[in-house]
Amino acid sequence: DKISSDPSLEVLAESSILIDTKTGNRLFEQNADRQHPIASISKLMAALVFVDNNPGWDTVYTFRVSDERPGAKSNVRPGEQISARDLFYDALVASDNAAIISLVNLTGLTEEQFVDKMNQRAVSMGLVETVFNDPTGLSTGNVSTAAEVAVFARQAFLQPDIREAVLTKSYELTLL
């Protein structure tokens, strides 16, 4: 059953959607097809693309100055070494922008190629209002709708590695 308006449900968000995670059916929506910048929600699509191109969870990465991005302070410093798994958790638990860039570098793709794969993945899911300009979500050009975010978030949560990381409340990084 779809609930399209319920006076007892007060939603303060400009756009929202509630879906049945098993069926994908919309249970409630409010301006769910209106496009907005999605900020760090972009990291879910980046995580999907990384999982598809993962060189191995134990792959060691040396953090670079060029990985640093504006936003929250990174948990890793230039020259420090860290596993792909720890970078993945840093990106999804702490929403570390630099960790996402490091994961991009670990795939061997350029940032532009990685973003192209994010957009290709969106198209393959039938998402027509979702566009990515960068993997971190710092770009206001990363846009989607609540309805389309629900689609790719659902796909992300079907991946055990992504689901586990996103549901983790805290994570201790190990520098190598």
What do these predicted regions represent?
Residues L158-L176:
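Conserved active-site loop region of the serine DD-peptidase/beta-lactamase
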